[in-house]
């Protein structure tokens, strides 16, 4: 379930980059490596999502809030985009619009199901779809130990890993070495930096 974007977002000169992909594809790892690579640059921002998930639950670095806290933030216009998925609520802070208005790049961990909301909020939207082979995904998910083998197989059988819709999508296959995928991610972001400068 997704919801309306923040009404003030939209007049940005920069590029909103939304990283999507299935669990186990390596989105968080690649975003962390890219953030480290671009850490000295003032024109590339990696935003943390606000999530109604306990901070110690694992996964990405995020701002953890209660359902009540999330609702208050949504009501006050604190999100550029927010959505629900897998029983949790996710939000992208509205302040990303400040960086975008300066012609910067903002990178966020998103969701394929919420891309139409990102597109409505950000006129210059690029999507990086991180994928990996089913065998690699299964191995990574099993290594996490959060799901049974049967649950993992059911997850992988749910459907294609492609992005559906009219979006500017770059595919990034992370089936090989993390170093190779990191270089691909950096090259994609370098290309987008060239577009805004």
UniProtKB/Swiss-Prot annotation:
EC identifiers of the protein: 2.7.4.23
Enzyme superclass (EC): transferase
Keywords attached to this entry: ATP-binding, Nucleotide-binding, Transferase
InterPro entries in UniProt: GK/Ca_channel_bsu (IPR008145), Guanylate_kin-like_dom (IPR008144), P-loop_NTPase (IPR027417), PhnN (IPR012699)
SMART domains, A to Z: GuKc
Pathway entry: Metabolic intermediate biosynthesis; 5-phospho-alpha-D-ribose 1-diphosphate biosynthesis; 5-phospho-alpha-D-ribose 1-diphosphate from D-ribose 5-phosphate (route II): step 3/3
Keyword check for Nucleotide-binding: yes
Pfam families associated with the record: Guanylate_kin (PF00625)
Record-listed ATP binding positions: 21-28
PROSITE patterns with a match to the protein in the record: GUANYLATE_KINASE_2 (PS50052)
GO molecular function: ATP binding; ribose 1,5-bisphosphate phosphokinase activity
Cellular component annotations (GO), alphabetically ordered: cytosol
Biological processes per GO annotation: 5-phosphoribose 1-diphosphate biosynthetic process; organic phosphonate metabolic process
Catalysed reactions, semicolon-separated: alpha-D-ribose 1,5-bisphosphate + ATP = 5-phospho-alpha-D-ribose 1-diphosphate + ADP
UniProt xrefs under Gene3D superfamilies: P-loop containing nucleotide triphosphate hydrolases
HAMAP family (alphabetical): PhnN
Cited function: Catalyzes the phosphorylation of ribose 1,5-bisphosphate to 5-phospho-D-ribosyl alpha-1-diphosphate (PRPP).
Family stated for the protein in its record: Belongs to the ribose 1,5-bisphosphokinase family.
PANTHER family to which the protein is assigned, alphabetical: GUANYLATE KINASE-RELATED, RIBOSE 1,5-BISPHOSPHATE PHOSPHOKINASE PHNN
UniProt name for this protein: Ribose 1,5-bisphosphate phosphokinase PhnN
Organism the protein comes from: Rhizobium etli (strain CIAT 652)
Gene: phnN
